[in-house]
Design a protein with these regions (language model features):
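Short, intrinsically disordered, charge-balanced linker/junction segments flanking boundaries
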Residues: 13-14, 37
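Short polybasic amphipathic segments
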Residues: 32-36, 107-110
């Protein structure tokens, strides 16, 4: 009886996640291997699927894998913007939130826009493809920053639509509830 109780107490701890899947992270390095399955000791490199070469590229986490002896998630099953899926080691991902601009999009100075209003100030056009930093999510727009170099950046608002990849439906539902 005691073993059964311990089993129910211990098992949830090994599969617990503080995030609701799916959620987004970004690549931490400019070279990361996407694998067929979560295996680090592959001497013949048979699990390697693709070499991802874009640091800060947003990825969607769709599954977590934790070894029974580990206190943290060891591997993440991710999906890329084009639908490709695979496994990546925990140290290859960052909590930094980024977005991928899939098509050219307008950058606005304010968090609302109306083509008929004099209050709408267009700061420019972001040419795709482009990775940008996600700063804030509002109902229909996101605040972003675009690195310019020399530690400076351009900040502004862009509408949330099909031209973006990296904002989840759950984030939008949370804002609208």
């Amino acid at each position: 009886m005691i073993r059964l109780v311990l089993l129910f107490v211990i098992l949830p701890l090994t599969s617990y996640s503080d995030k609701h899947i799916p959620y987004y992270k970004s690549l931490a390095h400019d070279e990361s291997w996407l694998r067929h399955y979560p295996e680090n000791q592959d001497l013949n490199k048979q699990t390697e699927k693709f070499l991802l070469t874009e640091e800060n590229m947003p990825v969607k986490v769709i599954e977590e894998f934790r070894n029974s002896w580990s206190s943290y998630t060891d591997w993440y099953r991710i999906e890329l913007f084009n639908g490709i899926q695979g496994w990546i080691a925990h140290n290859q991902l960052s909590k930094k939130r980024t977005l991928l601009i899939l098509e050219d999009i307008e950058l606005y100075a304010l968090k609302s826009y109306d083509p008929e209003s004099w209050m709408t100030i267009q700061k420019g056009i972001i040419l795709a493809p482009k990775i940008v930093n996600l700063l804030e999510v509002k109902e229909t727009m996101v605040k972003i920053s675009i690195p310019k170099g020399n530690k400076s950046s351009v900040k502004g608002w862009i509408p949330i639509d099909y031209r973006l990849w990296g904002v989840s439906d759950k984030e939008m539902q949370t804002l609208n509830d």
